């Protein structure tokens, strides 16, 4: 049957048709091999944008550094990083004038955070550059290694468990003449296997001590490791992203806390809120501009794009901003906040793995590590790579490149948003002192600019003024990639606005389907995605019902759990049929056990086990919720878990779903092969570290408690807490005298063991 496609749209407003333009089917592109080339591109580009700056040499590390601040004013439209300090400070002053007390209040909020944050804040986050091993590690391990090295070098402030005290150690470590670290290495040897009598390679792991002098340590402390950004759609070329080490992380966290607190108070800021809250905030700004432009004024909106936002930003500018924002605050607070930008002014970019060479004729492959690029003969490289290496050579030290200007991706998102908003703020009539005025939205490097004026010339003049003002603080609006429209139609951070934000449901399509975690989580995530899209993305009831049926079908095929009375034959059908036949209340069987689906769009918020609990046979209940089931390695399931869902565009989102622990919440065992590598010791450290952290959280459920005065370690804090809790429980009759005595005895034993150690 032929369908005329235009018929589909007869009743649909044009803006709703956006979901039909969905380009992102299939998998996004991933990068393979080394990111060295991309990192060199970033370093070279950043220096090119600031090339008219002044060169200097860092006295501690010997690194050549380029400082473009207060450089020549631009004479053309090329992107440049020559921010003018006085312009940035003036923009900050005007921002404060329009929002009285904003900086003061944010500083007070941040000061409180600084004093309360525990060092385990740094265990959040994924891959982190571990300076002790000179490669990436999970955040928790990198932190543990850093603290271990600090302690063995006599730096012990961190034992209090406060982040600020850990940072004191970081500062002290930079003054030390040398640091001793422990590195892992591998020995391989050939031995005969007793069973098979074949020769096998046996790997043993060794740890060795290594001393770093001040210069080498500083280089590592200031290093950002680089990787290639994966899964970026709509780009031909990959690009590099950076991951900083533990010395920088804590300082950045406090700066971003301050900036976040400021952004929350700025109506033009698209950060730190998200989702519907963000849409509401942005819709307000648009409404304000449209209301004011009544009949007399024209109103136009630019969907903006900035050229190489973070390569033209400069840490020295951020230092100036922080100095201004905190100007009436206590000295210690100003110092803590100024360290991050200072470290970034002296940062080093690690070039990654280096290059891989193959000789077709001799079937040889060899890796040229980044450290060798400084003095290898360039005749082996193709022309473009040769140019890159020649350009970067003066900047190289120990396989890292000195990169003073520029910010690297995703480091100071909040603070750079404050800078962007401060320019939007200058669009008020009392500052432009003319007939045009502007306002807009800023979220990291993405912006939308709304300009109002009595006529087209005024609009043009307003845009020009905005463009030039941005140039003065190192923001380069791209004239090629920005476009202007009558206000009412624009795009901002992948939200499309047409007389209101349009739900672009198709963006969420990749997150529909079976996640592949386990039967319990997958069911829960699947229905939650549908529920969330009904709430946030105009997913209508009929479509949602269809999505649900498709999901259940998909789920049954994935886990081979077709209904017990079906004709479909799979590996599991024999067992499932048997279960079906011996179950009295068949409606109580979970879908993953061959039961019927009881979900409809009204009850998506209820976990399946709860939905069917009353319908289950008693022995089936006992089987589903059985903590002693030997086949399920149970992690303790919180009532809410987080799943990572991939929308088509933008970063992976974290989504909460209800998690009910059943025998279907299994966790696949870890691949054994890791246990024979140098990672093994690291893995054991990591597990021990996680056990300690979760134990600690049992004692202090909020894990952000105010520290009891005079207590120096986690163990002592837990013992003292255990004693207090036991006494309260004993006096209120919740525990017996014998139990109370036993707890006290255990506490004393622990203290005794600590003293002996």
From Swiss-Prot:
Post-translational modifications: Phosphorylated by host PRKCA.
Keyword Cell division: no
Record-listed E.C. numbers: 2.7.7.48
Region (Promoter-binding site): 249-256
Any one Gene Ontology molecular-function term assigned to this protein's record: RNA binding
Region annotation Disordered: where it falls in the sequence: 53-82
GO biological process terms on file: DNA-templated transcription; symbiont-mediated suppression of host gene expression; symbiont-mediated suppression of host mRNA transcription via inhibition of RNA polymerase II activity; viral RNA genome replication; viral transcription
Function: RNA-dependent RNA polymerase which is responsible for replication and transcription of virus RNA segments. The transcription of viral mRNAs occurs by a unique mechanism called cap-snatching. 5' methylated caps of cellular mRNAs are cleaved after 10-13 nucleotides by PA. In turn, these short capped RNAs are used as primers by PB1 for transcription of viral mRNAs. During virus replication, PB1 initiates RNA synthesis and copy vRNA into complementary RNA (cRNA) which in turn serves as a template for the production of more vRNAs.
Protein name: RNA-directed RNA polymerase catalytic subunit
Organismal lineage: Viruses, Riboviria, Orthornavirae, Negarnaviricota, Polyploviricotina
Gene label: PB1
